[in-house]
Amino acid sequence: MAEDHTFTLNGDERWLVRFTTLEGGAYGYTYSQKSKRPRILIHDGLRGRHRLTIIVHELLHALYPSASVEHTEQAGKDIAKVLWCLSY
């Protein structure tokens, strides 16, 4: 069953964050603010630090759509590592 949350990002953009089953082995997807319904989908089977890393990674795609995948992967890992060590 999907778990939905709505957030305002980039000041005034309404984003849906949905935890749901994803097909094809993906852990997350970000559908840009250029779509009618900007949203982030996160695989609902993720737990712990891996889940946090994917959430941060997908949020970085939403906030910085022109950033490279390499940048969002490394920044996502680094931010998640700090948050995890601080018990968030």
Identify the function of each model-found stretch.
Residues 14, 37-39, 53, 76-79:
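Low-complexity, intrinsically disordered short peptide segments enriched in small/polar/basic residues
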